[in-house]
Amino acid sequence: MVNPGRTARALCLLCLALLLLGQDTHSRKLLLQEKHSHGVGNGTTTTQEPSRENGGSTGSNNNGQLQFDSAKWEEFHTDYIYTQDVKKP
């Protein structure tokens, strides 16, 4: 006999795995679009520095990985910390 609770848990885990795979695929697609657009926004929210192969400088760590504007990420982090402080003083 099939246990309904175990079946429901298995079904939920399967759906969660499919959603995570779909999200990963979507993220990779956005990164590829951003890489092919040579750092121009094209409506996406990532702010990348141009890669060395496109004539730009990626700093000291140039191993082919995408580099992001650290000032923008610091701003996001500061905004997040401020928001958390306001919510839970």
Curated annotation (Swiss-Prot):
Expressed throughout the seedling. More abundant in fragments containing shoot or root apexes where cells proliferate vigorously. It comes from the Eukaryota. GO terms for molecular function: growth factor activity. Sulfation is important for activity and for the binding to a putative membrane receptor. The keyword Secreted applies. GO terms for cellular component: extracellular region. It is found in: Secreted. Keywords: Developmental protein, Differentiation, Glycoprotein, Growth factor, Secreted, Signal, Sulfation. Glycans are attached at N42. Residues 33-70 are annotated as: Disordered. Residues 23-79, 85-89 form a propeptide. Residues 1-22 form the signal peptide. GO terms for biological process: cell differentiation. The modification Sulfotyrosine is found at Y80, Y82. The keyword Ribonucleoprotein does not apply. The N-terminal tripeptide (YIY) is the active core. Belongs to the phytosulfokine family. Promotes plant cell differentiation, organogenesis and somatic embryogenesis as well as cell proliferation. This is Phytosulfokines 1. It comes from Oryza sativa subsp. japonica (Rice). The gene is PSK1.
